[in-house]
């Protein structure tokens, strides 16, 4: 490319994926990730001067556009300046104010088949600690984001178990295999499980004589969130002082 002729992307997303603040969770999450995809792709190119997303706010339009209500839902905020999830993608790229948002309310009843699918953290913090029913599960950082060209890209939550399976007193190999399978069920559901998880299941059956009854029990106890005490999640955004290495929680989501 000719570096003497600046190249600027003047519009992306917008009418290609209209999103309302009251759309279902998967739609709002996809909207946010589409914005992150473009920002990450542009940041990876040295010969692109920048990009402008369409657009900041929803707006009134003519009778032939919008959702039959003469409103274009193209913004990362609604027309009253209330942020959609996609706004967090941009808010994360500054460091003046702490940001911590999740792509999910963590309510299984919001999703088809009670499968949450992939859940992302949006933050500009140095670390995010995840707790389930006050039990520590995992700590995430910006380095865990698949959006490697963004300073603060969305972070995929890949563990809902932590060390909780130690209560089952399994052998190390069995515990690792069960944890891998349960976390995969959380992300993909049964219908979209990767083939490698089927192989893991067969290995658990042959090596440790596990059966379907045991698998269902473990799923209901550690993943299913059905009945019993309500499952609560807590996420803490943590900033680290560069000079003293002291850590402080700057924002919490429950």
Locations of regions flagged by a protein language model:
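Exposed aromatic-hydrophobic patches
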Residues: 148-168, 221-224
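Short, aromatic- and glycine-rich surface loops/edge beta-strands on solvent-exposed regions
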Residues: 166-180, 187, 224, 228-243
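Intrinsically disordered, low-complexity acidic Ser/Thr-rich regulatory segments
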Residues: 195-232
């Amino acid at each position: 490319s000719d570096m003497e002729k600046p190249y600027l992307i003047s519009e992306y997303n917008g009418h290609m994926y209209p999103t309302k603040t009251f759309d279902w969770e998967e739609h709002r999450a996809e909207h946010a990730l589409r914005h992150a995809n473009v920002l990450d792709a542009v940041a990876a190119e040295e010969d692109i001067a920048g990009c402008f997303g369409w657009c900041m706010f929803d707006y009134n339009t003519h009778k032939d556009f919008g959702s039959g209500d003469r409103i274009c839902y193209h913004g990362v905020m609604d027309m009253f300046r209330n942020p959609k999830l996609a706004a967090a993608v941009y808010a994360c790229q500054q460091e003046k104010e702490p940001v911590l948002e999740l792509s999910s309310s963590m309510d299984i009843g919001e999703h088809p088949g009670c499968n949450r699918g992939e859940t992302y953290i949006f933050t500009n913090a140095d670390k995010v600690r995840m707790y389930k029913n006050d039990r520590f599960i995992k700590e995430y950082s910006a380095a865990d984001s698949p959006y490697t060209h963004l300073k603060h890209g969305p972070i995929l939550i890949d563990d809902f178990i932590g060390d909780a399976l130690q209560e089952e007193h399994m052998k190390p190999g069995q515990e690792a295999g069960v944890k891998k399978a349960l976390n995969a069920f959380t992300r993909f559901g049964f219908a979209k499980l990767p083939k490698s998880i089927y192989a893991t299941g067969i290995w658990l059956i042959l090596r440790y004589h596990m059966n379907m009854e045991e698998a269902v029990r473990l799923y209901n106890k550690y993943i299913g969130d059905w009945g019993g005490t309500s499952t609560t999640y807590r996420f803490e955004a943590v900033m680290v002082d560069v000079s003293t290495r002291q850590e402080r929680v700057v924002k919490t989501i429950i």
